[in-house]
Amino acid sequence: MSPALRGDGIGRRSMLFGAGALAFTAFGLTACGRSESGSTATSSVTTAPGDDRSVATDAYVFGYPLVLMDVTREHGAPANRFEHSRTLPDAANRTLVRPNQDTLYSKAWLDLRTEPVVLEVPAMESGRYWLMETMDMWTNVAQNPSSVRPQLSSGATGGPFTYAFLPPGWNGTLPPGITPMPLPTPQAWILGRIQVDGQADLPAVHAIQDGLRIAPLSAWVANPGAGNPAAESPSTADAVQIVAGMDGRAFFDRMCALMAIDPPAPVDAPALQRFAALGITPGGSAGKIAAEVLDGAVADGRGRVENYRDPANTIIEGWNYSAAAGRYGTNYGQRAYVARMGLGGNLPEDALYPTYYGSVDGNGSMRLHFAPGQLPPVDAFWSITAYAADGFLIPNPASVYSVGHQLPVATNPDGSVDILIQNAHPTAQVAAANWLPIPEHGKFTLTMRLYAPQPTAIDHTWKPPAVTNT
């Protein structure tokens, strides 16, 4: 059976920054760098000299996201064409780990090596959330237009929303009404999300997906509004396992070839200078390094990526907050770990995913109490989804998998909200929209999703309430 994919990004495993990850030891000395966005990040790659295996290990961690992205692209749809997810998962789904019940995905690989590519997002009813997260090939979120922040430089604010993704160094002229979206690499990935309000809403979302347009700039100019046809979803491949199966020579040769197409950022120059001693450069080759050294570096690097734990992770009232994803600077360890656990990590301003790890004990009934005015602060919407220990949705006769989004929660007379968390169907005194089923026995997790969270959620001024026994 092929391993399951993760539902928040398009990745492999279930517990992103979950409890139980091993502590991570930095690669020798620690250097600090400043990302192109201006934020300071801790580097996981030392610029000090070292033996060949140590340097190659650092290079593996550095290049892992690039190689993983390329393998994922290779097994995806053709470039500059959308592929759409069309269904909401249920407990019978055993493909996606930690799937969400809130959005449908529309994905497209971009190839800008010939010319810019135009994306048009259709107009839709007010209040429907959408996000067109666009990552460079190093998994940094390079652009993130959304319904909350459409980032238009021109055109109608109510849609359609028309953007042109520009390759590095492009200085041509765009037609009026198209917002430029420069990208740092000539290949990139759009991971689009569109809000869906339950099964009955699927036809409306399918129509929106069908209204997404993507085309090379020259084709768009010749026939405005026309786009490349959507692609059939390709067979699922486990890119993480494919990369894990590469020997040292295969991995580093591929990394060097890819860096010639999608170059690293200027801030990476110190690390690249160190790797150059082994021939690991854009378009280069590590051919002079013994195969056993490269194979050992791959094994060491794989262990470092798998066992990474970011010291910036936070636990608030029992809820685990991962460190900010999507913009990594020179924190190469975090970048590689997030890529392995699930490509498509959001920027905090687009989504937060506090996660609670629990176990059923006592009478098996728990409660989440939101004080008046203290529901999750968002500019879009929020939800809480329950998962079994294996990360899949929990079977229950009512087919209830989440609360907060598809049905409005009921408030108490004082304006507070109580969510009842238990396996048994609640009494009539509890609103159906306020019940979240969990397993009868054993471990479970809750993931709270905040779409377009407000600043108070991002800086932790607002804190989620603790899960308590009833």
PLM features: residue spans?
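N-terminal secretory signal peptides
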Residues: 1-10, 14-28
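Generic alpha-helix initiation/capping and coil-helix boundary signal
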Residues: 12, 19, 33, 49-52, ...
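General helical structural elements
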Residues: 16-17, 38, 90, 453
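Small-side-chain structural scaffolding
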Residues: 19-21, 26, 31, 56-59, ...
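Compositionally biased non-globular segments, especially hydrophobic aliphatic-rich helices
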Residues: 29, 43-44
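Bacterial lipoprotein signal-peptidase II cleavage site
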Residues: 33-40
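A compositional/structural signature for long, glycine/proline-rich flexible linkers
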Residues: 44-470
